[in-house]
From Swiss-Prot:
Family matches, as InterPro entries: LS, LS/RS, LS/RS_sf
Protein residues bound to 5-amino-6-(D-ribitylamino)uracil: 26, 58-60, 80-82, 113
Swiss-Prot/TrEMBL keywords: Riboflavin biosynthesis, Transferase
Protein name: 6,7-dimethyl-8-ribityllumazine synthase
Binding locations of (2S)-2-hydroxy-3-oxobutyl phosphate: 85-86, 127
Quaternary state and interactors: Homopentamer.
A GO BP entry: riboflavin biosynthetic process
Family membership noted in the UniProt record: Belongs to the DMRL synthase family.
EC class of the enzyme, as a word: transferase
EC nos: 2.5.1.78
Statement: the UniProt record of this protein carries the keyword Transferase: yes
Pfam families (UniProt xref): DMRL_synthase
Gene: ribH
Length: 160
């Protein structure tokens, strides 16, 4: 795990940003921890009530993220895909990653990919922001989405 080089998660005042979070319920303890990390960063940035939508699995995340990206300034996608014994893992990971990237580019809305793609459950726990976890990918994804939304807002302002 590369925890080296993690930037500050403080994004400053994002109170004018509308944030949505879509999180799967598969591996619920881990996904709920990711969601809590994202919500904590949102609160620290001045967003008291981000829109939260729960979906069953990771493969459902991109289409819901697309709907949310049409009505929000930033979207955070959270979930867990754990390697199994079949090629299904690769298909799901590719579909989710490609789907989220496409949504972000097609809508010009930041969609932060906080979907963990790991070899085993312990790797997911280590990244979920649970007690004893080395990282909090939910918090990191929220910070990335908010920071990018603020950057895009500045870039879109007419030059005086």
């Amino acid at each position: 795990m590369s925890g080296d080089g993690i930037p500050s998660l403080s994004v400053g005042d994002a109170s004018g940003i509308s944030l949505a979070i879509v999180a799967s319920t598969w591996h619920d303890q881990i996904c709920t921890a990711l969601l809590e990390g994202a919500q904590r960063v949102a609160t620290e940035a001045g967003i008291d009530r981000p829109t939260v939508v729960r979906v069953l699995g990771a493969i459902e995340i991109p289409v819901v993220a697309q709907a949310l990206a049409r009505t929000h300034d930033a979207v955070v996608a959270l979930g867990v895909v754990i390697q199994g014994e079949t090629p299904h893992f690769g298909y799901v990971c590719d579909a989710v990653t490609t789907g989220l990237t496409r949504v972000s580019l097609d809508t010009s809305t930041p969609v932060a990919n906080g979907v963990l793609t790991v070899n085993n459950e312990q790797q997911a726990i280590d990244r979920a922001g649970l007690p004893g976890s080395a990282e909090d990918k939910g918090a990191q994804a929220a910070a990335a989405a908010l920071d990018t939304a603020l950057t895009l807002r500045r870039l879109r302002q007419p030059w005086a």
